[in-house]
């Protein structure tokens, strides 16, 4: 504003002499243009940047599992990766060979991903399978928000304009804004160097398992560790992405080659994968479908579980229905509510229970709120669920965004009973290391326990992460629960003795190891 005011004052003075009017909007565009031109020049010049067609990049990186760590505000579980990428900026295509390490992985896991022509393919060994539109969008952003592509787009943007300057890390930055790839972006240019320091944009990610739940997601990508490369081009080697104010990913490039000759088959995707991808894209546009209905108690149709990628259940009580879990998406929960009304006509849904702070586990809770249904949740999850209910959904409005309603939560801090009769429910906060923000749901008349997300099927054994299983077992023992069968978010009905046997095997193995 100071710059515009200065120009206006100068223009006012000039009116008395040569009558040269200058508008603030023109000044903003001119100054923005000059900022971009300086940045392009510092990066090597427009002609050199435009000549970058392909790249081969090697990097190390990590990702914070913001969506499913022990605490939503950190510290977060970390996943590490080492990757080599072939990029075709003109085509918008990318091939990545990577090895990943993380929780539950004793060794690195190798895989390849190819994204081209709006299709994403995963290759593991000789197996190829379709991925989702989430990977297509991620690659699109990786390529289009690279600093050289960003600055070239700014040069030709019709709506390029300057915003008030600011400071980042104590240093002054000029700020420009424009529309890039149909997204409004804001770029911060370091006053001292002229180089891009960060870019911000906001968008919805309806195809993302984790990010769809937050509606309009705020992104901030910082560029650091610039290096002058052969050919006179200056690019950053480190990229740090934050989403909704939390650090998300970090990558450090260890080797980069510009304009290499790429193999002709670098971006080949099999016809079968293309067909399967399009089918999955159509089928999964609003998240996975509701699972297969199965009785929780054989011969009793008042208790039904829907078994799929994200399990949930309907419990009939004398005074109404209780929904157990509203995971993954509004559409998934709408389907669950439709089943409740179909199976139990004229019986109201009196409550819903959400048992975890993992994002996909509460992804349909906004639909519950939109239907005016009270919700039982762990007391420790009040901050994240409140933030979720108040999240902006302007780009892809859900039911709650279209018709706002107040949320009614019952925050569970100790044993809480819902209903009476044979299907009464008892809620118990887990209060353990891995599941401190999870909750058990016990069906005392049926000796049935819902273990939230702590007990999951394993790939190389009966269960994933035996520590989680131990904590679920200990929590049930602490509350003096008599359990014969159990089920969870990702595991169908199973005998509790399987848990006991698996823990006994682990304890026996540990005892022998200690003796040796």
Language-model regions, residue ranges each:
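Flexible, processing/modification-adjacent segments and terminal tails
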Residues: 30-34, 114-185, 191-195, 203-217, ...
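Zn-dependent metallo-beta-lactamase
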Residues: 250-318, 416
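Gly/Pro-enriched, hydrophobic low-complexity segments
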Residues: 169-271, 442-444, 451-452, 457-479
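Divalent-metal (often Zn2+) His-rich catalytic cores of metallo-beta-lactamase-fold enzymes
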Residues: 240, 473-516
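N-terminal mature ectodomain segment of secretory-pathway/periplasmic proteins
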Residues: 37-127, 159-164, 330
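Conserved beta-strand hairpin/beta-sheet module of binuclear metal-dependent hydrolase folds
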Residues: 295-340, 438-457
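Active-site metal-binding motif and surrounding structural segment of the metallo-beta-lactamase
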Residues: 331-376, 478-483
């Amino acid at each position: 504003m100071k710059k515009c005011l200065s120009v206006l004052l100068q223009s006012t003075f000039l009116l008395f002499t040569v009558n040269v009017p200058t508008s603030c909007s023109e000044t903003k565009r001119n100054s923005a243009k000059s900022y971009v031109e300086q940045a392009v020049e510092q990066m090597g010049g427009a002609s050199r940047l435009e000549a970058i067609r392909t790249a081969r990049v090697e990097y190390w990186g990590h990702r914070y599992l913001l969506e499913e760590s022990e605490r939503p505000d950190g510290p977060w579980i970390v996943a590490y990766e080492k990757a080599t990428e072939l990029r075709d900026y003109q085509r918008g295509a990318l091939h990545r060979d990577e090895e990943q390490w993380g929780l539950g992985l004793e060794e690195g896991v190798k895989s390849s991903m190819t994204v081209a022509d709006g299709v994403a393919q995963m290759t593991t060994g000789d197996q190829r399978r379709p991925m989702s539109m989430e990977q297509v969008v991620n690659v699109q952003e990786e390529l289009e928000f690279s600093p050289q592509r960003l600055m070239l787009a700014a040069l030709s943007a019709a709506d390029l304009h300057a915003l008030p300057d600011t400071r980042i890390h104590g240093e002054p930055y000029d700020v420009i804004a424009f529309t890039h790839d149909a997204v409004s972006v804001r770029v911060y240019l370091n006053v001292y160097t002229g180089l891009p320091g960060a870019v911000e944009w906001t968008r919805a990610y309806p195809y993302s398992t984790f990010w769809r739940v937050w509606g309009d997601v705020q992104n901030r990508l910082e560029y650091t560790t610039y290096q002058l490369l052969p050919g006179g081009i200056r690019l950053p080697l480190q990229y740090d992405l934050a989403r909704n104010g939390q650090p998300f990913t970090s990558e450090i490039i260890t080797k980069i080659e510009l304009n290499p000759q790429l193999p002709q088959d670098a971006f080949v995707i099999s016809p079968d994968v293309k067909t399967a991808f399009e089918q999955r894209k159509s089928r999964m546009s609003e998240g996975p479908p509701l699972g297969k209905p199965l009785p929780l108690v054989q011969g009793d149709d008042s208790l039904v579980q829907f078994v799929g990628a994200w399990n949930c259940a309907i419990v009939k009580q004398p005074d109404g229905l209780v929904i157990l879990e509203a995971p993954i998406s509004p559409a998934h929960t709408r389907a669950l509510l439709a089943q409740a009304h179909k199976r139990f006509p004229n019986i109201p849904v009196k409550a819903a229970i959400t048992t975890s702070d993992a994002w996909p586990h509460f992804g349909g809770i906004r639909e519950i709120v939109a239907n005016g249904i009270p919700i039982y949740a762990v007391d420790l999850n009040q901050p994240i669920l409140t933030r979720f209910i108040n999240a902006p959904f302007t780009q892809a409005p859900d039911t709650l965004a279209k018709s706002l309603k107040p949320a009614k939560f019952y925050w569970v801090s100790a044993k809480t009973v819902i209903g009476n009769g044979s299907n009464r429910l008892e809620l118990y906060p887990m209060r353990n290391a891995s599941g401190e923000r999870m909750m058990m749901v016990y069906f005392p008349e049926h000796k049935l326990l819902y273990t939230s997300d702590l007990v999951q099927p394993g790939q190389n054994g009966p269960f994933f992460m035996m520590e989680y299983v131990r904590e679920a077992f200990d929590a049930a023992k602490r509350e003096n629960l008599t359990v014969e069968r159990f089920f969870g978010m990702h595991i169908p009905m199973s005998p509790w003795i399987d848990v006991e046997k698996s823990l006994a095997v682990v304890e026996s193995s540990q005892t022998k190891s200690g003796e040796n």
